[in-house]
Amino acid sequence: TYIDGDKGILLYRGYPIEQLAEKGDFLESCYLLLYGELPTQQEKNDFDRRIMQHTMVHEQFSRFFQGFRRDSHPMAVMVACLGAMSAFYHDSIDITDPQQRMIASIRLISKVPTLAAMAYKYSIGQAFVYPHNSLSYAANFLRMCFAVPCEEYQVNPVLTRAMDRIFILHADHEQNASTSTVRLAGSSGANPFACIAAGVACLWGPAHGGANEACLKMLKEIGSVKKIPEFIARAKDKNDPFRLMGFGHRVYKNYDPRAKIMQKTCHEVLKELNRQDDPLLDIAIELEHIALNDEYFIEKKLYPNVDFYSGITLKALGFP
């Protein structure tokens, strides 16, 4: 990944993130990141088929989940499940073997959505939904999360595309905290599943993967558009611990290119679900307007980042 923070540019293997998010799908970006080039149509078909052949997880995982409380944080569950994968797939735990590393990569890409959906289903007391390999990667994930046995699940192309974009935008971001954690764990010779579990544990932090959750919590705390000036004043007050979440980035000193894509995606999802009047979106739009025109934010280069709209989008999709 290449980032130019001053110009607001993000490239995956030389390709602009805007191009990949608009014209491709997540598995195409996975192929690009793994192999360095975009796939031909035949290579893409073969790669998709290979991923879909590995979407099932060992049936023992169903019993593994029973050891968790229903109200466990999903990231805690994911850390445990990813670490446990090394106990189930012994033929791909040698990190020094390139072939085993690739098999582990394929398995992780394939099985993480299944495990994440299982974690969600377990938390709400619903039956697990097995993967359906005729569906796309994103559609399969949404179905595993939200399908119920008593009715047929209808794939919504707008929501599926939104989920796909969320996956693409978060696929890679240079040497960030979780990537550094994975590489550090790997430097000790730890198996790939343990390394990824360590990375997910790092991603759990509120300053990293938890930022969109914190941003959504902030919008709820503000409560209404009328109260925005009060919170803006608090954000400017050095003696007030309140911080505006979803603004600014350690790398980007310009508008986060992922935020523009996420903003468009958020509007598409809310329109599809007939929720354009969502009060959280009204607050977000007004906050963004103020931040882009207020001298304080301009001087400090506090532009909206990808977390600003992704929390609202995920909430609208049905994730708690």
From Swiss-Prot:
Catalytic reaction equation(s): oxaloacetate + acetyl-CoA + H2O = citrate + CoA + H(+)
Gene Ontology terms: cellular component: cytoplasm
List of catalytic residues: H249, D307
Pathway, per record: Carbohydrate metabolism; tricarboxylic acid cycle; isocitrate from oxaloacetate: step 1/2
InterPro entries reported in the protein's UniProt record: Citrate_synth-like_lrg_a-sub (IPR016142), Citrate_synth-like_sm_a-sub (IPR016143), Citrate_synthase (IPR002020), Citrate_synthase_AS (IPR019810), Citrate_synthase_bac-typ (IPR024176), Citrate_synthase_sf (IPR036969), Citrate_synthase_typ-I (IPR010953)
Pfam families referenced in this protein's UniProt entry, alphabetically: Citrate_synt (PF00285)
EC annotation from Swiss-Prot or TrEMBL: 2.3.3.16
GO MF entry, a single one: citrate (Si)-synthase activity
NCBIfam families linked: cit_synth_I, PRK05614.1
Similarity comment: family membership: Belongs to the citrate synthase family.
More details: Citrate synthase is found in nearly all cells capable of oxidative metabolism.
Protein name: Citrate synthase
Species whose genome carries this gene: Bartonella doshiae
